[in-house]
């Protein structure tokens, strides 16, 4: 499965870092807004102030964590594309596993293995859903079979013309 909308490999890393940062800031902002609202003292003004304060403090940190994950994932993915010479779902699955392992490298080895497995499984699920959606939607865009004419108007297989046409077999 080939993706045509992706940037070439050196720029893909920057593109994925920016996209991951944006996802982290938006998603983290929504989550932190709810969390800050719920944990603030009673009163609408206090709750709104707590919500904005939580977003201001935590959303950039969450976005940065997402950007690190996206950058490392894309770097490993581009390295595998270069090493293997082809771009397929196995690169993404392996990149997810290696990214999980590298980001958990400061922990105990068991946590590193667990993070690698979770990264690989998560990317395998994402790639599998992508392949299924591609196959499902590809059926919608197949060319329709050509319109068949009325078989009675087509010449017969023996070379005799259909009704209303003169026979030229005598001139052969």
From Swiss-Prot:
In which domain of life is the source organism classified?
Eukaryota
**Which GO biological-process labels does this protein carry?**
protein import into mitochondrial matrix
In its UniProt record, a GO molecular function of this protein is: protein transmembrane transporter activity
Where in or outside the cell is it found? Mitochondrion inner membrane
Q: Name one Pfam family in it.
A: Tim17
Q: Which family does it belong to?
A: Belongs to the Tim17/Tim22/Tim23 family.
- What name goes with this protein? Mitochondrial import inner membrane translocase subunit Tim17-B
Give the source species: Bos taurus
Q: Corresponding gene?
A: TIMM17B
